[in-house]
UniProtKB/Swiss-Prot annotation:
Gene Ontology cellular component annotations, sorted alphabetically: cytoplasm
Protein's UniProt keywords contain Coiled coil: no
Annotated InterPro entries: Prenyl_trans_a (IPR002088)
Region of interest (Disordered), residue spans: 363-383
Keyword rRNA-binding: no
This protein's name: Protein prenyltransferase alpha subunit repeat-containing protein 1-B
Coiled-coil regions, chain positions: none
One GO MF term attached to the UniProt entry: protein prenyltransferase activity
Keywords per UniProt: Prenyltransferase, Repeat, Transferase
Species whose genome carries this gene: Xenopus laevis
PFTA repeat ranges, renumbered to this chain: 85-118, 120-153, 178-211, 217-250, 293-326, 394-431
Similarity comment: Belongs to the protein prenyltransferase subunit alpha family.
Length: 431
């Protein structure tokens, strides 16, 4: 009994030390364990150095069961905890075990009651992800909090009779960029972090509203990352999502894009300014150029890193998007329409409608708009000059590329993947 009392006193002190560390430095950005089998000094096991919080490993076997059991007793109504105690206990527990759903649910209740600032939970989740970057419960709770934060922003703007609409829109975009950074850090800490990349897609769909500028910016910003992580399926899948979303924008096929909720959609939400949304969506982009550049990047990576199946799987998906683009435009073309010719995968000529031709004849303006009177951003305008759509997107060019790989490569894995890709190409074309 005496030993249990000593442990309880120790654990209570550790919880207070963790709470005190956050009060002394609210900018803590990383948490980690310090290997220490035994307590060698009579001091706190919580170490704070600049913005890094360390926990000596010897205390975990006492600390984690204590806060876990304490929270369960509270949920079973066998123990009363006041507001501050609940916040401290759940914070400590989630930093050590962020997949404990009950703790997140308790914090949801605190947020709903107005006791806990939801921004604090975003900070806690971000910190937990530095130690547990794949924690599914942390990502799930983060999405719930983000929805609530944006809802509060929207309601505040509506109550204010649109007085703060521009500020609200900018704040939402700031949240989007912050989430992109959180996802980037988590993806770098854990290979093929599906949860991180899935959250990134969710943010673009539900907070970014699938606007064109964000899609293109993300395509550009992740190029270097995937070049450094050539075996990361999730990272390449994210780029496939971006290109597919741009394809759906081009074809105006809303059925192929996940529906955006009314939370921030302009048509249903008067809070977001129509002109600001137009600036984000009326950006000229050259989809054939983007697809061709993706194929070039893929080929460079295949040459530099032979034998990686991820790269071949990605090439399949990009060529499939090219095939879909050519097929859709071929079906929608009319004899009266102004057209541009592109060689499709079968060697035939697809005549593109005048609507699509406007995309392939204009430079891709990332930060600006076609109308100089509607410049919504003061950033330096970035333009990518498009090259004519070449035969590099055709089936024949792909077959020549595969033959070159099979002839020159020395990697048996590369040869096997190339042969499998050729078989897939021929089946796609109906051979």
């Amino acid at each position: 009994a005496e030993w249990k009392e000593e442990v309880e006193v120790l654990v209570q002190r550790v919880v207070k030390d963790i709470t005190g560390a956050f009060r002394r430095n609210p900018n803590i950005d990383e948490i980690g364990l310090i290997p220490c089998p035994e307590a060698t000094y009579n001091r706190s096991p919580i170490v704070l150095v600049e913005n890094k919080l360390g926990v000596e490993s010897w205390c975990i076997k006492f600390l984690l069961p204590y806060v876990h059991n304490k929270l369960l007793l509270y949920r079973q109504k066998k123990l009363w905890l006041n507001r501050d105690e609940l916040i401290d206990v759940t914070c400590t527990l989630l930093l050590l075990n962020p997949d404990f759903t009950t703790a997140w649910n308790v914090r949801k209740e605190l947020i709903q009651s107005g006791t806990l600032n939801p921004v604090k939970d975003l900070q806690l989740g971000k910190l937990a992800l530095t130690k547990f970057p794949k924690s599914p419960e942390t990502w799930i709770h983060r999405r719930w909090v983000l929805q609530r934060v944006v809802q509060e922003l929207v309601v505040a703007a509506v109550v204010g009779k649109d007085a703060t609409c521009p500020e609200t829109y900018e704040r939402i975009q700031t949240i989007v960029q912050e989430e992109m950074h959180v996802c980037y850090e988590a993806a770098g800490r854990y290979p093929s972090n599906y949860n991180s990349w899935s959250h990134r897609i969710w943010v673009i769909q539900h907070l970014g509203n699938l606007n064109v500028k964000l899609l293109i910016d993300e395509l550009s910003s992740t190029k270097h990352w995937v070049s450094m992580h050539v075996s990361d399926h999730s990272g390449f899948h994210y780029r496939q999502f971006l290109l597919k979303s741009l394809l759906c924008k081009t074809l105006k096929d809303s059925d192929n894009v996940t529906a955006v909720p009314d939370l921030i959609a302009n048509e249903k939400n008067p809070c977001l300014p129509r002109e600001g949304e137009a600036i984000w969506n009326q950006i000229c982009f050259d989809l054939p150029y983007l697809l061709e550049e993706e194929m070039k990047l893929n080929r460079e990576l295949l040459d530099s890193y032979p034998g990686h199946e991820t790269l071949w799987c990605h090439r399949r998906q990009i060529f499939k998007l090219i095939h879909q683009l050519l097929l859709e435009q071929s079906q929608s073309a009319t004899p009266q329409s102004t057209s541009a010719s592109i060689t499709d995968g079968s060697g035939n000529i697809s005549h593109l409608s005048s609507t699509f031709q406007s995309y392939v004849t204009n430079p891709m303006d990332v930060d600006g708009m076609s109308d100089p009177n509607k410049q919504g951003y003061t950033q330096e305008t970035k333009r990518l000059k498009r090259a004519p759509v070449q035969d590099s997107l055709s089936l024949d060019s792909e077959l020549r590329f595969i033959n070159c790989v099979l002839t020159n490569c020395c990697s048996p894995e590369q040869s096997r993947f190339a042969a499998s890709y050729r078989k897939w190409l021929l089946s796609l074309q109906g051979y």
